[in-house]
UniProtKB/Swiss-Prot annotation:
The keyword Ribonucleoprotein applies. HAMAP family: Ribosomal_bL35. Pfam families: Ribosomal_L35p (PF01632). Belongs to the bacterial ribosomal protein bL35 family. GO terms for cellular component: cytosolic large ribosomal subunit. It comes from Rhodospirillum rubrum (strain ATCC 11170 / ATH 1.1.1 / DSM 467 / LMG 4362 / NCIMB 8255 / S1). This is Large ribosomal subunit protein bL35. GO terms for molecular function: structural constituent of ribosome. One of its GO terms (biological process) is translation. Keywords: Ribonucleoprotein, Ribosomal protein. Transmembrane segments: none annotated.
Amino acid sequence: MPKLKTKSAVKKRFSLTGTGKIKVKVAYKSHLLSNKGTKMKRQARGTFILCDADQRIVKKFMPYG
């Protein structure tokens, strides 16, 4: 049986926490920032944990994660 491959897009965009949850960078922070409010830019600074339904989908693409 050959090794399963991890999707490159998933590898770049998501990271696993120590407890096995999936962490993601918040969207809307890459370009066209002059049109966006200060509050929106501040809230888009960090990362967040995916919900359980989305975690199940993403984990299918990360067989060894």
